[in-house]
């Protein structure tokens, strides 16, 4: 379990970026696989989700998850609906005791909190979602709801590190076409190109005017017993992979 020091200061919320330890899954999913979309046994995933939620709430669990699509779509949860299928990549709420969850396996989980309005968001940002502007859309929604940028606190959770995120030339060209300033997120070593996802997201948050940003510098690729990693599983020839979960709620 990893916590943001900046968010930890605020007692009206609870959060956690969880790793794979402590669950009941076995095999390639060993530990706390929370991915409903994985090929793991459904009963194990359900048990793991309950265990994860109890890390931040001992009371009745109301957990909202997404059908994540690497998009820039978000949902503002005003009324709790357990059966609703939320399709997109960000959740926002002001409701108390409602846990927002994001699943990742190399992509970045992001939390945003307005300390005055008591508004929270959980964002799933892989390169596609970040490129499409999911972070910008969520921040704009906060502002529309009355947030002042100086009151926003953001935390970027564990994701794949730059040294393990090799990309192709077409990938880099796509980002440079967006703006040549994106070149700073790429590094060239031994004829290979590497991309920094968390740095790219950090600079987006800064450009939007958020100054209080925490980067959890934990690599999901290595070591293998700490987090689930889609890229590592593919490299090892595994047919599937587990998902890490990140949770945030207003008390």
Predicted regions and their residues:
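Active-site microenvironment for binding and transforming phosphate-containing groups
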Residues: 1-251
